[in-house]
Amino acid sequence: MKKIKEAEQRKLRRKKRIKDKIGRGVASRPRITIFKSNRYFYAQVIDDSRGHTVVSISTIEKSLNLSKNIDDIKKLGEVLAKRLKEKNINNLIFDRNGYKYHGLIASFATSLREFGINI
């Protein structure tokens, strides 16, 4: 039990440190935030100045039919990049939400970069 609490506290400290460094997203450069559950992967692009979600995507969408593995997360990044291009958004602030930058998070960010989104 103690190890779980310590891990949670470390994640919260990482999350706060990241938020302090990246700041807030604006209309010209919105913030993309990530959330992982045990089963699904979610990403949403947020304009913090208006408090609105500009674009969101997840593996739970029926039309995508994706699971939570690295290959499908790369496809998710590709689809999100296309949706962002439709809305003329090319620059983002990447908020990894306290998660370590490896595995799914890293492959998602790399996929966005490969399809022309500046992070």
From Swiss-Prot:
One of its GO terms (biological process) is translation. Gene3D superfamilies: 3.30.420.100. Keywords: Ribonucleoprotein, Ribosomal protein, RNA-binding, rRNA-binding. Residues 1-10 have a biased composition (Basic and acidic residues). This is one of the proteins that bind and probably mediate the attachment of the 5S RNA into the large ribosomal subunit, where it forms part of the central protuberance. Belongs to the universal ribosomal protein uL18 family. This is Large ribosomal subunit protein uL18. The lineage of its organism: Bacteria, Pseudomonadati, Spirochaetota, Spirochaetia, Spirochaetales.
